[in-house]
Amino acid sequence: MSETECGRFSTISRETISNVERQLSQPPSVWLNLTGARIIENEGQFDKDIALPNNKSHVTHIAVDIGGSLAKVMYYVCESSSPSSSSSSISEAENYTGGRLSFMIFETAKIEDCIQFMANLIDNHVKNCNKKKITLIATGGGAYKFYDRMSKQLDIKVIREDEMECLIMGLNYFVSCIPREVFVLDLDTCELTFQNHLNCYHYPHMLVNIGSGVSILKVTGPSQFERIGGSSLGGGTLWGLLSLLTPANSFDEMLELSKGGDNTSVDMLVGDIYGKDIGYERFGLKSTTIASSFGKVFRERKPLEEFAPQDISRSLLLAISNNIGQIAYLHAQKHNVQNIYFGGSFIRNHVQTMHTLTYAIQYWSNHTMNAYFLRHEGYLGVFGAFMKYATSQPSNVPVPSIS
């Protein structure tokens, strides 16, 4: 080989070398049969485990999505294992029929609890498998912030994946493969109507992901999307302000407080301005329409302790939900999108939140746009991360890429 020919090797770019190293470090893809998948209905929580009765493969992956407020874990257990126990193995045997996808959620402020949970999963699994075969796929900002800690404490391969790509991939799989996952809310009866993905999953559509903040993604094809907007006023805003204004210690406690609240004791309504039972009919504003969130607080000049925590919680929840709903509508109008999917742990399948978002979309669009929700709305990212390294049946679910 001549000196010139040898010199060609020095022209390989650093980016090319990094790409090759990345491909070599990737774990082998696991097989996951999603045919016949169903949500397990005989459990208390709404974000239930997903049964995979036809999966017979050995699954050695764990996925985690670590956001600013919450960390979500997804893992696979065989059907004989307890889905809620931290001692459950990831996959207990080579020869068994069926299993389930299980989900857990932790506060990011208590990330050590999350890491310990994953460590317990791994330790139990090591009894049946070489630890080197186990891979953690991490996404979200915490995948970078806590990368060194997870790698050191878990002592397994940790791979980081793009947050937005995982969100879209998770949405694709939930909508395409999981029956009774997507639904709409009736504004009059608050009844849920589950959707057939063939009827509702059209392009373009929008994903409004509401976590600590809000990201709005426009999906233009089976594997193309772009981030078109967002807001800093999201779940973290609600959590932070209610931590200051109420005795609630967790997000779920805040949502529970809001269920028993009366926002009219703190919100100024159209009727408070025009007179009781009088609205602004010219613009379709009923007397019960909120004119100013927290508008009565200054006017009444009462100390904080004289306002019920329940009323404050409901008012702030409505304020943030209304704001997100209107922003979502404006982006959908600008980009000519009719179908809007709402995801993220802020929603928590909370009826008042979904009702407010649905009302905002229908009101501002004059009923020309649709608001869709998911039962696993907080797990889009972690599901997408999990499926990044899985070969699935059905095999026609698209893999996203940033536009």
Curated annotation (Swiss-Prot):
The modification Phosphoserine is found at S80, S82, S84. GO terms for cellular component: cytoplasm; cytosol; nucleus. GO terms for biological process: coenzyme A biosynthetic process. It holds the Pfam family Fumble. InterPro entries: ATPase_NBD, Type_II_PanK. It is found in: Cytoplasm; Nucleus. This is Pantothenate kinase.
